């Protein structure tokens, strides 16, 4: 589960020190370089307490001193920055055609990024868990060899995931009521770091809000451009999770009631009209694509090449998909009033042709009297969900679950 914090607050309950360590760490992460006095002023903790907490964070290799600054009135202050050199957070994306893994340090810098083909629809949950575990073990072994310590792993899945890590329904993987967290725990052999499971779009929008081109935007929607289309939503700087943890299923809004059959069993869903599989089938009518391929990158590359060459069939398919996406986005935008809508996944290389009709459709259907939301392509590309998984681990640390010295 992801909890988005508005900012650090001093603790007034049981484990005061552990919580206040997290308060100081979060402040340094957001404001480095900073001084102990800066921390005390911002958090309300007294200077002696801050000094003691900083010593503890330095001992844990989470924070380090970087010298003095004289750009202030009074005595020069010793400045602090993030350390975290021994630590990494790992995120992993499960999709119908690939697995993606990213490891980041405490400031979000990537230290490892892998992508592997994966036949998701042809794999049983146990086989998928084994593949996830194998990739995770390889990554952990490399990171440990490089002197790193893994703080946690968050796995993103394209489907409905409850708070216990059970995948309730993932049509593009053929899963229903799969206790992935337990299955993965067995496959990993009870690792010495926490493992969690979440929805892919939720993790992707978290990544965009932290590291994307519009980082810090308080009202944002992210659309996964994979085999399926999901939406991660941040409203007023908080992630929307709904009553059961299943919001954002924009891919199953009905766009064409008499349209193609969707993987969910209904007809005319956005996924069936403008998902990457439907788009490829329309844009490349002469291709061998049969909806069962496990790596769509060659087909996406071919769509890009034909679009650049001005192929009329390809351009028409992209235009239709863009308008359908804009239509669906307008429904959500009229409800939530986002500032930015981010298209991710396979939609990124297709953005030059998808964004203009999508923006046009959104503008035409928006009821807001002023300029509507801006639709942009993700700068995180295919790795947004995995990056968001790593960010979720960092949030877990920021909540007070600090590594032991």
Give the location of each predicted region.
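General beta-strand structural signal in soluble alpha/beta enzymes
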Residues: 65-66, 194-199, 233
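Glycine-rich phosphate-binding loop and adjoining helix at the ATP-binding site
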Residues: 110, 115-219, 353-364
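Short glycine-rich anion-binding loops that position phosphate/pyrophosphate groups of nucleotides
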Residues: 69, 158-160, 226-228, 347-348
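Glycine-rich phosphate-binding loop of actin/hexokinase-like ATP-binding domains
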Residues: 215-274
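ATP-binding/phosphotransfer module of carbohydrate and carboxylate kinases, centering on a glycine-rich
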Residues: 1-68, 72-76, 81-117, 121-149, ...
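Short, acidic, Ser/Thr-enriched surface-loop or helix-capping motifs
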Residues: 105-106, 162, 234
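Short, glycine/acidic-enriched loop or turn micro-motifs at the edges of active sites
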Residues: 96, 203, 227
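Short coil/turn connectors at secondary-structure junctions
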Residues: 85-87, 191-193, 215-220, 229, ...
């Amino acid at each position: 589960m992801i909890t988005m914090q508005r900012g650090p607050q001093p603790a007034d309950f049981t484990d005061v020190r552990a919580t206040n360590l997290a308060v100081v760490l979060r402040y340094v992460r957001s404001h480095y370089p900073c001084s102990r006095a800066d921390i005390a002023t911002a958090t309300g903790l007294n200077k002696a307490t801050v000094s003691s907490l900083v010593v503890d964070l330095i001992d844990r290799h989470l924070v380090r001193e970087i010298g003095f600054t004289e750009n202030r009135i009074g005595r020069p202050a010793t400045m602090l920055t993030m350390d975290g050199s021994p630590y990494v957070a790992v995120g992993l994306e499960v999709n119908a055609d690939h697995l993606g893994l990213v490891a980041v340090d405490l400031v979000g810098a990537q230290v490892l990024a892998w992508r592997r083909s994966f036949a998701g629809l042809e794999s049983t949950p146990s086989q998928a868990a084994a593949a996830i575990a194998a990739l995770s073990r390889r990554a952990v072994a490399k990171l440990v060899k490089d002197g790193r310590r893994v703080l946690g792993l968050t796995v993103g899945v394209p489907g409905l995931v409850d708070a216990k890590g059970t995948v309730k329904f993932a049509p593009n993987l053929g899963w229903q009521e799969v206790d992935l967290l337990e299955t993965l725990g067995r496959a990993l052999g009870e690792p010495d770091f926490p493992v969690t499971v979440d929805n892919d779009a939720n993790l992707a929008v978290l990544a965009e809000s932290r590291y994307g081109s519009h980082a810090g935007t308080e009202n944002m929607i992210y659309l996964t451009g994979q085999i399926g289309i999901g939406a991660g939503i941040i409203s007023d700087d908080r992630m929307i999770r709904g009553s059961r943890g299943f919001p954002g299923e924009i891919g199953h809004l009905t766009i064409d009631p008499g349209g193609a059959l969707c993987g969910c069993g209904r007809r005319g869903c956005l996924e069936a009209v403008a998902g990457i599989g439907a788009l490829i089938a329309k844009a490349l009518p002469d291709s061998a694509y049969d909806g069962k391929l496990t790596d769509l990158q060659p087909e996406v590359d071919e769509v890009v090449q034909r679009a650049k060459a001005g192929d009329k069939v390809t351009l028409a398919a992209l235009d239709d998909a863009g308008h359908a996406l804009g239509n669906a986005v307008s429904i959500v935008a009229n409800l939530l009033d986002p500032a930015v809508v981010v298209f991710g996944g396979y939609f990124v290389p297709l953005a030059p042709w998808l964004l203009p009709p999508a923006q046009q459709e959104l503008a035409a259907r928006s009821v807001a009297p002023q300029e509507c939301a801006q639709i942009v392509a993700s700068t995180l590309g295919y790795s947004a969900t995995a990056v968001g998984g790593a960010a979720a681990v960092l949030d877990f640390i920021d909540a007070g679950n600090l590594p032991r010295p």
